[in-house]
């Protein structure tokens, strides 16, 4: 199922997994009380409505899943939805089993750096943002027919050095999450 998001409760943590065919987003957060382990798939349209309510909310959302439905309580609003039936895609098979490199960097710093090197990218001049991961820095660069942009940021790095390219729009999508 790709029309919904996986909510997985395991070891007193809630993991939410979303896929769009190009990217995987995973968010894991501890739960305040004990729950039995389970997996449910919540429709994407329901979560879009819940997100609208959360943007205007100061408080916490309460999530109450049942066997076939889920209830979200946000401030004075209640959203009830049927759950999707079927198995969520096996996203774990797309994740590397052994990590050879781990990079820890400030989300804001990374986004600002990607924005700077993306100035040369247009709809006509698409080019990946290349990241060269060294000992304690990440060098970002982009080359188009208009020129070359480079930037460098500090990072905590363990493992092998690496060079990898990304679509800048996918990296910049983290902006909305970083602002929360």
Q: Which ranges hold each PLM region?
A:
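Bateman (tandem CBS) regulatory domains
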Residues: 94-98
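DNA polymerase processivity clamps
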Residues: 1-28, 32-84, 99-180
């Amino acid at each position: 199922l790709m029309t919904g998001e996986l909510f997985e409760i395991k070891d007193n943590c809630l993991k939410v997994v979303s896929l769009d065919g190009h990217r995987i987003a995973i968010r894991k957060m501890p739960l305040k009380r004990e729950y039995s382990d389970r997996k449910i798939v919540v429709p994407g349209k329901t979560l879009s409505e819940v997100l609208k309510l959360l943007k205007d909310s100061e408080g916490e959302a309460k999530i109450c899943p049942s066997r076939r439905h889920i209830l979200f309580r946000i401030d004075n609003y209640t959203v009830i939805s049927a759950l999707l039936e079927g198995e969520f895609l096996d996203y774990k098979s797309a994740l590397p089993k052994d990590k050879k490199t781990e990079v820890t960097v400030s989300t804001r710093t990374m986004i600002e750096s990607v924005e700077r090197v993306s100035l040369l990218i247009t709809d006509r001049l698409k080019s990946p943002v290349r990241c060269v991961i060294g000992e304690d820095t990440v060098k970002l660069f982009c080359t188009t027919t208009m020129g070359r942009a480079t930037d460098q940021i500090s990072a905590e790095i363990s493992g092998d050095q690496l060079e990898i390219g990304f679509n800048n729009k996918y990296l910049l999508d983290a902006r909305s999450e970083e602002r929360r």
